[in-house]
Amino acid sequence: IAGNSGKAFKGQRSDGTPVFVKYEMPPIVSVLAREQITPPILSANREAGMGHRVEQEWLNGRTLERQDMGSKQVRQILVRMHYSRILLNQALQMNYTYMKPQDLVHRWQKEAPARLAQNTYLQSICQDLLNHLPNFRQEVATFVHGDLHHTNWVETTSGLVYLTDWE
């Protein structure tokens, strides 16, 4: 299956049911599946020489288009994800950490392509952001996904929408 990891496959269970198989899936996905943000997990186990293997329900449907990102279902999933204390607490138990706003700006400055990082206008925006950031309040921090591109979302033939990429 197309993607950056090279560890995602379409498989088939012994009863012929198609499944999405992923090796080395982040542990948070099981919590996201319970919250109905990602597709249901059918099984998870360790395989010798292959690592952690997860099978998720195979979804027949389509990848969302850019114009779909404002849909009611996408908004509802994001609200559920961003305001779930269960999800945040589970993530913290799995050693995920809080990222403060200044951390995000510093990360961008460090990881942006040189052409963007050297752009004086963007440098001034980063500096302005750093100079005017509000104080970080951990009690209102939320769990977020760093790449909400429309290609990371699927709408099933039955109309359900899931966020699918957690790399």
Feature annotation, model-predicted:
Residues 1-2:
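Protein kinase glycine-rich loop
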Residues 6-13, 130-167:
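Active-site acidic catalytic loop and adjacent metal/ATP-binding pocket
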Residues 15-55, 62-81:
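A conserved alpha-helical element in kinase catalytic cores
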Residues 27, 118, 158-161:
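A conserved long alpha-helix in the C-terminal portion of kinase-like catalytic domains
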Residues 56-59, 108:
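Surface-exposed, active-site-proximal loop segments in enzymatic domains
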Residues 93-134:
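Active-site catalytic-loop/activation-segment of kinase and kinase-like phosphoryl-transfer enzymes
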